[in-house]
Amino acid sequence: MSKNSKAYREAAAKIDAGREYTPLQAAELVKETSSKNFDASVDVAIRLGVDPRKADQLVRGTVSLPNGTGKTVRVAVFAAGEKATEAEAAGADFVGTDELVERIQGGWTDFDVAIATPDQMAKIGRIARVLGPRGLMPNPKTGTVTNDVAKAIEEVKGGKISFRVDKASNLHAAIGKASFDAKALAENYGALIDELLRIKPSSSKGIYLKKITMSSTTGPGVAVDTHITKNYTAEA
């Protein structure tokens, strides 16, 4: 939906630009203003009161969304032997070691999440320049470098997402699909906010949640009340 299109203008007209909505109200508006041509992703953009140039304020982590993401997550697992067998049994889409590295060196990145056992990280270092910029590099902090590959696969396929603040102090995350009911979206939103508050850097001063906007992939943004940090599915 182009911002210059009639459909976009009509959708934007349904939103009070000077108002902050409850998470549930925002989810309802996002659903109402989303394109009807496809099942759009529902995203949140959050401006945090942190300075990501400081190591102790680089907000990053993971959260399991209670209602999943609505996406089919393709998982590549770097593992050998027994761990490779476990990964295959757990539903990994691609499993291997050197052969996976070689495919990626050749330009292939047709997966959404990469998981690796610790003993494979030296090999993965050869493709860090490919995986890193795409947000695909396995990392112990996000639970994607682990010997418990079955659990990691179950989590990412079940709705576990990663997030990280960017250089401009903004954080973006997908919390579901426009086909979700509004309550499910509000619950997923709440899980993300709860986790962000849990890991708030102690050195962060002033307002932490500065601005939050919820939108579909192509729809207009809806401002969410940053003061609501519980009862996310309440009407008002």
Curated annotation (Swiss-Prot):
Which Pfam families does the entry mention? Ribosomal_L1
This entry carries the following GO cellular component terms, namely: large ribosomal subunit
GO MF annotation, one: tRNA binding
Q: Which domain of life is it from?
A: Bacteria
The GO annotation for biological process reads: regulation of translation; translation
Ranges that cross the membrane: none
- Which Gene3D superfamilies does the entry link to? 3.30.190.20, 3.40.50.790
Keyword Repressor recorded? yes
Cytoplasm is among the record's keywords: no
Please name the InterPro entries in this protein's record: Ribosom_uL1_bac-type, Ribosomal_uL1, Ribosomal_uL1-like, Ribosomal_uL1/biogenesis, Ribosomal_uL1_3-a/b-sand, Ribosomal_uL1_CS
Keywords assigned by UniProt? Repressor, Ribonucleoprotein, Ribosomal protein, RNA-binding, rRNA-binding, Translation regulation, tRNA-binding
**What's the subunit arrangement here?**
Part of the 50S ribosomal subunit.
Function (record text) = Binds directly to 23S rRNA. The L1 stalk is quite mobile in the ribosome, and is involved in E site tRNA release. Protein L1 is also a translational repressor protein, it controls the translation of the L11 operon by binding to its mRNA.
Q: Spell out the HAMAP family in the cross-references.
A: Ribosomal_uL1_B
Which PANTHER family does the entry link to?
54S RIBOSOMAL PROTEIN L1, MITOCHONDRIAL, LARGE RIBOSOMAL SUBUNIT PROTEIN UL1M
Which family does the UniProt entry place this protein in?
A: Belongs to the universal ribosomal protein uL1 family.
UniProt protein name: Large ribosomal subunit protein uL1
Organism encoding this protein: Corynebacterium efficiens (strain DSM 44549 / YS-314 / AJ 12310 / JCM 11189 / NBRC 100395)
Source organism phylogeny: Bacteria, Bacillati, Actinomycetota, Actinomycetes, Mycobacteriales
Q: Which gene is transcribed and translated to give this protein?
A: rplA
